[in-house]
């Protein structure tokens, strides 16, 4: 299983690769898109400057820096939906990206995916992004027919569900998101913009609340459900416990979230994922062992214990009983 890391600038690439990243992905907003939609609506769901290469030339430098270490770079063009008039222009942009050595694009709009399929760029992967909400093998098969050779699964899935999809994916390579950026909503159905340079998204804010249901007060269980996500810092999201088992079930790449974050944070994330993967390869652990090791590594990485609201794979928490067992192993 490869480690796929975000990258924003050429000078970050060596440190990320040294930490263990084997693939990188970046953001880029073409000038014509900025002219059409202004500074808020991005073609890759990140509008603040830190999350995108500053120019096409800077992106080319980034690709060159990664290629010196034989590490491929993908570029996110994963806005959805995309206005029809922009599809041909983004296909032209993809052609320019292929020319400078970008190895693929991440897309989340079906019309763009189909147009890129028809363009038939050589050695250029079409990656179906997580906004397609691929929760099952039928969704993966549909996206494969639409041109995707890689699919990023919905980030709300359990490790067992991911393993089941991998078994039916055939030649389609599967990516799973598993570190930083856990979404409290079903991401593919969420219309929030991710445009705050401070990286506090609308789903993390505390809102005034009113109640229109039966009774005079908001029921405690409703308040508790809301409180699980309010004020949550997605920087602390983690799925380390599942990494050894995801690798053994055939996930192609573990994707780390974090375009626009500081270089040190990206490097720490890559190191943590690489350390958990290496430990899993040496020990071939069951679920309970993975859970214990993941929690210890989380504490080392963040300096605090893991919490339920930050957990990508809650089935690895003690209350879940580690119900998933890989064939031939006891949890």
Model regions: which residues?
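Conserved nucleotide-cofactor-binding alpha/beta core module
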Residues: 136-138
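As written
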Residues: 147-148
């Amino acid at each position: 299983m490869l480690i796929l890391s975000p990258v924003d600038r050429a000078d970050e690439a060596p440190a990320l690769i040294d930490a263990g990243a084997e693939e990188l992905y970046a953001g880029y907003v073409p000038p014509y898109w900025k002219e059409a939609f202004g500074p808020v609506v991005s073609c890759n769901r990140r509008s603040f400057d830190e999350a995108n290469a500053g120019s096409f030339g800077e992106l080319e430098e980034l690709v060159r820096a990664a290629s010196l270490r034989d590490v491929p770079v993908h570029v996110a063009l994963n806005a959805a939906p995309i206005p029809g008039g922009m599809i041909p222009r983004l296909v032209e942009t993809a052609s320019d990206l292929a020319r400078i050595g970008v190895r693929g694009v991440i897309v989340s709009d079906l019309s763009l995916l189909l147009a890129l399929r028809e363009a038939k760029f050589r050695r250029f992967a079409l990656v179906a992004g997580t906004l397609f909400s691929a929760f099952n093998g039928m969704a993966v098969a549909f996206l494969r027919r639409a041109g995707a050779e890689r699919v990023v699964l919905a980030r709300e899935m359990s490790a067992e569900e991911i393993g089941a999809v991998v078994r039916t994916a055939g030649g389609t390579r599967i990516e799973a998101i598993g570190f930083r950026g856990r979404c409290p909503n079903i991401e593919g159905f969420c219309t929030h913009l991710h445009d705050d340079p401070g990286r506090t998204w609308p789903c993390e804010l505390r809102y005034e609340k009113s109640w229109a249901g039966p009774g005079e007060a908001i029921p405690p269980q409703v308040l508790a459900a809301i409180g699980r996500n309010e004020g949550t810092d997605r920087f602390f999201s983690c799925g380390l416990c599942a990494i050894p088992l995801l690798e053994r079930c055939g996930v192609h790449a573990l994707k780390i979230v974090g375009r626009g974050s500081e270089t040190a944070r990206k490097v720490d994330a890559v190191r943590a994922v690489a350390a958990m993967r290496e430990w899993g390869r040496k020990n071939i652990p069951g679920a309970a062992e993975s859970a214990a090791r993941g929690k210890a590594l989380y504490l080392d990485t963040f300096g605090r214990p893991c919490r339920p609201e930050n957990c990508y794979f809650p089935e690895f928490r003690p209350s879940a009983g580690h119900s998933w067992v890989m064939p031939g192993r006891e949890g």
